[in-house]
């Protein structure tokens, strides 16, 4: 056997072994959380997998449909990527200095949801984000949107924090609930849990009225998020859902010019900038 054949055989063996050693993503998920299975199973043929992208393929095979199909379905099997239904949860929360129950699916058909995760109570960047969202809550309310903050702390910790004055590092009264993810199952289901630390990254998800995740960002622990950008993204999302034949260019804000997703019609936008 030639050296090239031996090398090729060894490479094939290593690749085959590496596939055996890879852990299943589903083993990392909470057993209490269910997800929509959008793509074929791993045993499907490559042709079957390709057929899973039929919604994307229509963008090139059907010109008339392409102008109305710019909200693609995610092809994720496990993690709640954009385009998938948000994992449902029910948990205790603190609102108006009382303990309440929050169930995500109860907002379906009623409101958009801004769901954001933060690492821990009584920390440093976290209160600046939480109070910033609270101070702008009326603006979100006008957009038919609920805000939910989530951390792995208990409801007792949440309560103590809202009962602490802002000038002392507390939150004061908030205009939206703080959810307790003390079992860490919610953070895990949304893919933001740091396993070896047991806390969540700064994940933020915009969920539409159908319960579908339309936007997500995940910041590392030391980087705070922008309420302005969250608001702008929410407004852009609502605009394109109300105007499915249009898309929003970079930095778009309400009242600014949108774009027709068509090679000819888009020239109207580009000629005006």
Swiss-Prot record:
GO MF annotation: an example: peroxiredoxin activity
- The Thioredoxin domain extends over 80-239
Specify the transit peptide boundaries.
Answer: 1-72
Q: Where is the active site?
A: 126 (cysteine sulfenic acid (-soh) intermediate)
Catalytic reaction list: a hydroperoxide + [thioredoxin]-dithiol = an alcohol + [thioredoxin]-disulfide + H2O
Coiled-coil intervals: none
Extra facts: The active site is a conserved redox-active cysteine residue, the peroxidatic cysteine (C(P)), which makes the nucleophilic attack on the peroxide substrate. The peroxide oxidizes the C(P)-SH to cysteine sulfenic acid (C(P)-SOH), which then reacts with another cysteine residue, the resolving cysteine (C(R)), to form a disulfide bridge. The disulfide is subsequently reduced by an appropriate electron donor to complete the catalytic cycle. In this typical 2-Cys peroxiredoxin, C(R) is provided by the other dimeric subunit to form an intersubunit disulfide.
The record's listing under InterPro entries reads:
AhpC/TSA (IPR000866), Peroxiredoxin (IPR050217), Peroxiredoxin_C (IPR019479), Thioredoxin-like_sf (IPR036249), Thioredoxin_domain (IPR013766)
* A GO-annotated cellular component: plasma membrane
**E.C. numbers:** 1.11.1.24
Name the keywords, alphabetized: Antioxidant, Chloroplast, Disulfide bond, Oxidoreductase, Peroxidase, Plastid, Redox-active center, Transit peptide
Tell me the function of this protein.
Answer: Thiol-specific peroxidase that catalyzes the reduction of hydrogen peroxide and organic hydroperoxides to water and alcohols, respectively. Plays a role in cell protection against oxidative stress by detoxifying peroxides. May be an antioxidant enzyme particularly in the developing shoot and photosynthesizing leaf.
Which coarse location class applies to the principal site listed for this UniProt protein?
plastid
Spell out the Gene3D superfamilies in the cross-references: Glutaredoxin
Source species, please? Arabidopsis thaliana (Mouse-ear cress)
The keyword Thylakoid is assigned to this record:
no
Root EC class: oxidoreductase
Example GO BP: response to cold
Compartment(s) of residence: Plastid, Chloroplast
Return the protein name.
2-Cys peroxiredoxin BAS1-like, chloroplastic
């Amino acid at each position: 056997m030639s050296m090239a054949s031996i090398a090729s055989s060894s490479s094939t063996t290593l690749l085959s072994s590496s596939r055996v050693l890879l852990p299943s993503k589903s083993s990392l998920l909470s057993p209490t959380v269910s997800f929509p299975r959008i793509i074929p199973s791993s045993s499907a043929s490559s042709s079957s997998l390709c057929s899973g992208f039929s919604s994307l393929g229509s963008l090139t095979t059907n010109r008339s449909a392409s102008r109305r199909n710019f909200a693609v379905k995610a092809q994720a099997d496990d993690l709640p990527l954009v385009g998938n239904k948000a994992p449902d949860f029910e948990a205790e929360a603190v609102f108006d200095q009382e303990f309440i129950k929050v169930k995500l699916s109860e907002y379906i058909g009623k409101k958009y949801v801004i769901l954001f995760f933060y690492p821990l109570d009584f920390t440093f960047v976290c209160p600046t984000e939480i109070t910033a969202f609270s101070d702008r809550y009326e603006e979100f309310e006008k957009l038919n949107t609920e805000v939910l903050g989530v951390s792995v702390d208990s409801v007792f910790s949440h309560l103590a924090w809202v009962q602490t004055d802002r000038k002392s590092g507390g939150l004061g009264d908030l205009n939206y609930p703080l959810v307790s993810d003390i079992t860490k199952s919610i953070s895990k289901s949304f893919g933001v849990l740091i396993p070896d630390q047991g806390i969540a990254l700064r994940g933020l998800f915009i969920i539409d009225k159908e319960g579908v995740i339309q936007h997500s960002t995940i910041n590392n622990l030391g980087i705070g998020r922008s309420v302005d950008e969250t608001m702008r993204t929410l407004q852009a999302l609502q605009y394109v859902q109300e105007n499915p034949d249009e898309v929003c260019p970079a930095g778009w804000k309400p009242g600014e010019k949108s774009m027709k997703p068509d090679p000819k019609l888009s020239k109207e936008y580009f000629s005006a900038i």
